Amino acid sequence: MSMLPSFGFTQEQVACVCEVLQQGGNLERLGRFLWSLPACDHLHKNESVLKAKAVVAFHRGNFRELYKILESHQFSPHNHPKLQQLWLKAHYVEAEKLRGRPLGAVGKYRVRRKFPLPRTIWDGEETSYCFKEKSRGVLREWYAHNPYPSPREKRELAEATGLTTTQVSNWFKNRRQRDRAAEAKERENTENNNSSSNKQNQLSPLEGGKPLMSSSEEEFSPPQSPDQNSVLLLQSNMGHARSSNYSLPGLTASQPSHGLQAHQHQLQDSLLGPLTSSLVDLGS
């Protein structure tokens, strides 16, 4: 631990002051402290000093200087989350000023796609909604075991994933809501399928029989008229009766011929009467 020339602080002490001022939110004082540091390359390459410079640059809206610091130096993984937030928030602010309105979820996604994180503050692992895939894997595994973690378990999950307790709580809440919505949709589809199947069964014809005629077909079907063959058959029978030697029912052989003729006329009237009536009805 060597004292910096003409300054009175060691490198470790400078790093400690930078961390304390950052955590306390004294960013203006932190900026003045950084400005007072001597021109020492070894000191200015200290990671705590570089991180402090990035925070001050963001606070003052000097985003070009911020991007230069983040892209020019390799930072330790434990500093990545903080520096990634600075990178993304700076690009969000610039995009909002350019568009003249706040960014929504889609707008922020497009900014992230357009300005990906530099490898100096990112380990290359794919992220989803700023959650690393490794963190999401831990949360999914716990969700399969218990969708309702206790406050103590949420704190443990936050430590294991590098997330905050609020982020863990929101992840479980959103996941439960998505699962409930998916279950409701699946249940609705099942009910609709069952209802459609029941309707098809009700409309199916009787097994082994012909499809039933609808009531409209029955109401508007015309009455069947006697065909020509029936009329010819009737006339043939009557002629056969006149030439036959056998007596007709109700008559004896000893009856005179005029009685037989009268009975034939009576039989003709009784048979042709309904037939004629039907033909008249059809013609009207």
UniProtKB/Swiss-Prot annotation:
Keywords: Activator, Apoptosis, Cytoplasm, Developmental protein, DNA-binding, Homeobox, Nucleus, Phosphoprotein, Repressor, Transcription, Transcription regulation, Ubl conjugation. GO terms for biological process: aorta morphogenesis; apoptotic process; branching involved in ureteric bud morphogenesis; cellular response to 3,3',5-triiodo-L-thyronine; cochlea morphogenesis; embryonic cranial skeleton morphogenesis; embryonic skeletal system morphogenesis; endothelin receptor signaling pathway. It is found in: Nucleus; Cytoplasm. Phosphorylated during interphase; becomes hyperphosphorylated during mitosis. Hyperphosphorylation impairs binding to promoter elements. Ubiquitinated by the anaphase promoting complex (APC), leading to its proteasomal degradation. GO terms for molecular function: chromatin binding; DNA-binding transcription activator activity, RNA polymerase II-specific; DNA-binding transcription factor activity; RNA polymerase II cis-regulatory region sequence-specific DNA binding; sequence-specific DNA binding; transcription coactivator binding. PROSITE patterns: HOMEOBOX_1 (PS00027), HOMEOBOX_2 (PS50071). Its main location: nucleus. Residues 168-284 are annotated as: Disordered. Residues 179-190 have a biased composition (Basic and acidic residues). GO terms for cellular component: cytoplasm; nucleolus; nucleoplasm; nucleus; transcription regulator complex. SUPFAM superfamilies: Homeodomain-like. Residues 227-284 have a biased composition (Polar residues). Belongs to the SIX/Sine oculis homeobox family. Interacts with DACH1. Interacts with EYA1. Interacts with EYA2. Interacts with CDH1. Interacts with TBX18. Interacts with CEBPA. Interacts with CEBPB. Interacts with EBF2. Transcription factor that is involved in the regulation of cell proliferation, apoptosis and embryonic development. Plays an important role in the development of several organs, including kidney, muscle and inner ear. Depending on context, functions as a transcriptional repressor or activator. Lacks an activation domain, and requires interaction with EYA family members for transcription activation. Mediates nuclear translocation of EYA1 and EYA2. Binds the 5'-TCA[AG][AG]TTNC-3' motif present in the MEF3 element in the MYOG promoter and CIDEA enhancer. PANTHER family: HOMEOBOX PROTEIN SIX, HOMEOBOX PROTEIN SIX1. This is Homeobox protein SIX1. It comes from Mus musculus. The lineage of its organism: Eukaryota, Metazoa, Chordata, Craniata, Vertebrata.
